[in-house]
Amino acid sequence: MRIVIITGLSGSGKSTAVRALEDEGFFCLDNLPVSLVTTFIELVEHSREDIKDVALVMDIRSRDFIKGYDQVFQAIASAGHSVKIFYFDATDEVLIRRFSETRRRHPALEGATVPEGIRFERDQLAGLRRIATAIIDTSEMNVHRLKELVIGLVKGGEGVLEMQVNLQSFGFRYGLPLESDLVMDVRFLPNPYFVATLRPFSGLDQGVREYVMGHKETVVFLEHFRDMLELLLPSYRREGKSYLSVSIGCTGGRHRSVAIAEELYNYFRQRNVNIKITHRDIDKGLG
């Protein structure tokens, strides 16, 4: 029997995932007490119905599960069944918006605000997140995309959506992009702003790009940063992440960060990475 544990943060899409698994023929059960897991498995094994796939939703609502999830997984393994743990996540901003739209209270802490509930839940589930088979960030997903991803995961990875990389340049002067997964500060590179003939232009212009790339430290940095991204991207894909935001920052977001982002974009696009590029602050501070 194949068993999938659906867990993660409240508001992250677990209910949608369960509906997708039900459509695939899974027998789904929500909020099963830990003390009944072994009994439930035995009942399914001896049932007259041919149940081969089971999904159990187990999360913060069951404090016994949070304290003893290792015992749950051990009991399943001892019974000779395979188990996958799908951990659903989203950014705090997205979770807060979802709770606001549905006007629901956060279930983790009675009487707490939604942000307080999210922080508490993240802390309580941190250990479970570390051992998950897949971590699914639903921040940028619609319902259709989430269902397709879940179905792909239970089929052993077949049909899993390709991760999208969103590469953007920005200026630290205007604040960090809140949605960033990775941030690289390139303010250590030579600055075309201090070259009078280059100042009016941007990192999209050939003269600025040649100036930035014409220094040895830029070439060495870019080589190492590309290598790091090539190492990280497959790991994020295996984690189940569908969207990765990489932000490159300089002082004003017009020269160095734009030039470096363009170099990275062209490099990874030639290697068939699903990548998009934006320049958040390129037109700011022009007058």
Curated annotation (Swiss-Prot):
Coiled coil: none annotated. ATP binds at residues 8-15. The keyword Phosphoprotein does not apply. It comes from the Bacteria. GTP binds at residues 59-62. It holds the Pfam family RapZ-like_N. Keywords: ATP-binding, GTP-binding, Nucleotide-binding. The keyword Iron-sulfur does not apply. InterPro entries: P-loop_NTPase (IPR027417), RapZ-like (IPR005337), RapZ-like_N (IPR053930), RapZ_C (IPR053931). Transmembrane segments: none annotated. SUPFAM superfamilies: P-loop containing nucleoside triphosphate hydrolases. One of its GO terms (molecular function) is GTP binding. Displays ATPase and GTPase activities. Belongs to the RapZ-like family. PANTHER family: RNASE ADAPTER PROTEIN RAPZ. This is Nucleotide-binding protein Gbem_0872.
